C-alpha cells in the first residue's frame, strides 16, 4: 500500500468536481447588496434614504428626478435628483423651487 502526500492526493470522479465547486462557492465573497449613493440599488433599508437635503438646485443640471412617497420606511416624502455628472442629491420637498420642479414634472406626465 502506497500513501500519497497531501500535495499528491487526488480526488477523481464526480465527487471531486462537486467538492471543488463547493469550495469555490464557500470562498467566493458575496456581492454588494447596496450602492454607496443615497438610493440603494438592490436592497432598500427600512429607513429614510435622505439624511440631509439641499433647498435648491439648477434644473438644467438634473438628468433624472425620483420622488419617494412617505411610507413605513420613512415618514416623509423624499426627492432625489440625479445630476448630469452622475451624482445623486437629496432635495428638500418643502422648498418652493423643488415644489415647482416636481409639479412641472407631474403636469407633463398627465399630458402624455
Curated annotation (Swiss-Prot):
Disulfide bonds join 48-74, 50-90. GO terms for molecular function: chemokine activity; CXCR chemokine receptor binding; heparin binding. One of its GO terms (biological process) is antimicrobial humoral immune response mediated by antimicrobial peptide. Keywords: Antibiotic, Antimicrobial, Chemotaxis, Cytokine, Disulfide bond, Heparin-binding, Secreted, Signal. Residues 1-36 form the signal peptide. GO terms for cellular component: extracellular space. It is found in: Secreted. Induction: By interferon tau and phorbol ester. Its main location: secreted. The keyword Secreted applies. SUPFAM superfamilies: Interleukin 8-like chemokines. CDD domains: Chemokine_CXC. PANTHER family: C-X-C MOTIF CHEMOKINE 6 (PTHR12015:SF201), SMALL INDUCIBLE CYTOKINE A (PTHR12015). Chemotactic for neutrophil granulocytes. Signals through binding and activation of its receptors (CXCR1 and CXCR2). In addition to its chemotactic and angiogenic properties, it has strong antibacterial activity against Gram-positive and Gram-negative bacteria (90-fold-higher when compared to CXCL5 and CXCL7). Belongs to the intercrine alpha (chemokine CxC) family. This is C-X-C motif chemokine 6. The lineage of its organism: Eukaryota, Metazoa, Chordata, Craniata, Vertebrata. The gene is CXCL6.
Amino acid at each position: 500500500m502506497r500513501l500519497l502526500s497531501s500535495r499528491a492526493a487526488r480526488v477523481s470522479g464526480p465527487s471531486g468536481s462537486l467538492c471543488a465547486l463547493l469550495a469555490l462557492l464557500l470562498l467566493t465573497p458575496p456581492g454588494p447588496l447596496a450602492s454607496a449613493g443615497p438610493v440603494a440599488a438592490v436592497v432598500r433599508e427600512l429607513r429614510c434614504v435622505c439624511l440631509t437635503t439641499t433647498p435648491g438646485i439648477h434644473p438644467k443640471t438634473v438628468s433624472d428626478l425620483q420622488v419617494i412617497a412617505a411610507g413605513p420606511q420613512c415618514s416623509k416624502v423624499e426627492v432625489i435628483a440625479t445630476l448630469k455628472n452622475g451624482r445623486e442629491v437629496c432635495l428638500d420637498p418643502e422648498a418652493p423651487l423643488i415644489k415647482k420642479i416636481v409639479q412641472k414634472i407631474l403636469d407633463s406626465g398627465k399630458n402624455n
